[in-house]
Amino acid sequence: RRTTFSYSEFFSKLIDGEVYFKLENQQFTGSFKARGALNKILTLNESGKSISSVISASTGNHGAAVAYAARQAKIECNIYIPEGSSKAKMSNMKNYGATINIFGSDCVEAEAKAREVSEKNQVPYVSPYNDFHIVAGQGTMGAEIKSQANELDAIIISIGGGGLMAGTASFLRSVWPNIKVIGCSPSNSAIMIHSMEAGKIL
């Protein structure tokens, strides 16, 4: 779904420049995650193999997006989540048709279990970030921005696993080589920064 690219008068005055927001809350399931999930499920369906279900791990937005994409493709969806996950987000995933499996005390353990079950049962695992088709799907946001704006000086992108940053920045750098790309990572979940410092995916 194409989302609004909205000028912010308040923030533009605050920095004495022009600030725009890409309103991905308007996207299917309420976040940009639907872009990658839909692209991934679409490519699975076009692979020539008979796909009847997918597996993923998530605490919220990605799980809802995968469940939505799976429902559109009329296939089953199993999501692994850790204990103590938000009941509201769990309910949201269920509403989109996901079967919820609670495992482990954190996202790392839930993801490891999901990958284990995926491999054992030969069911495709849909990664939230470490997948070319997910990244390419997220990159459609960059293509939309290009069609909605004149050349930008800079773009600020939130970073979790890095899928949105990788996809969007790759596209925008290809059409606007001089654009400055800035990633923002939450201080209480700076896994991308730690991974970059370690030189490997943590």
Region locations from a protein language model:
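PLP-dependent amino-acid enzyme catalytic core
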Residues: 1-202
